[in-house]
């Protein structure tokens, strides 16, 4: 009798274990079939931004995306629009930031990756820099902050699974911005150090194997009338033909202790400017086609490149695009000085060149939030915007103008999340309609972010098992 009871217990245990195993297998299979609308959950901090760009490139049927992941290292993923297949994310390099637990600022956020594909099919990223440090050597074009600017390249064309880091760009860079011209020339723009540094570019004519020495195009220098230095924040993009276009605002980089403002050094920016770099002849010019003496100083910028003087309110993050005739549109975030170390809430202001003068658009109906600008014709202009609604709903939307940018109306919502917010990338380079922009969802209580690839049909979905990278 005792033996029978013992055997019965064993049989029940085996049965229960088998059931439990079967349940786990069913759950595993269901998880692999369940789709979510994010492609990865390991975005970290401000995982993407407008300034480090492009964060994504569409090429030969595939969209490639890059973002900041755990420990501020760069990650790259891809989506095949024909097969609906995701690959990655793969860690593409190791940042010198994000590893020091003793730092007061745990997440630096300045070294997010910019991505480019060269004419041979190799994928490039620039990442990891916030101006470099003194032990890296002498910075002849500015001062120092943190991190180390790095350049990594895929080991095989169009294959993002393996990477190598090349020592061929300045390690003092930050805010990396990549541009590839039609002839294959690659330009890497960045600030050569911390706030009190020149903005420069390096050029490659051999698919990023080598780069020229840094060339300054925006000059930092000491002010003589106040205790501060001139500093800049440009946003660089492709124009028409051989042109590179630049929108930028001015940072008055006050001394920590100065006689003019008791707040000391604060993120105070003013004005918005525009200029063009003709890469065919190497000349810089303003919107009136007047040549500019480079590197550009504050005095010359005010005289020749000013879009709008904004002396009292604070500005942030200029963006620009041109219509098919080369007429530029410029937008910049503007918020009031509230006598604090930050400005009040900022809203996009939009300006357009009519061939004779800069005109200010009516954007009073735009919600507060950051975004990118797309000009598709002389009359059609779109703004891709992140914002929070009055009901605390994070939203990514598009606002369209059909009157050349005079006014904008909300036309499409790509994504909404309750009790969340988003950080947004610039528009993907040469975007597929289904994959125009990358966003990271900000949730309370965690520094990790769900990453979304958004297009005209909303977010591109992925299996839950593949998207939950942090559980691997």
Swiss-Prot record:
One of its GO terms (molecular function) is lyase activity. Substrate binds at residues 46, 109, 112, 130, 191, 195, 233, 265. InterPro entries: Sialidase_sf (IPR036278). Pfam families: BNR_4. Coiled coil: none annotated. The record marks 191 as: Neutralizes the sugar carboxylate group at subsite +1. Keywords: Lyase, Metal-binding, Signal, Zinc. This is Ulvan lyase. The lineage of its organism: Bacteria, Pseudomonadati, Bacteroidota, Flavobacteriia, Flavobacteriales.
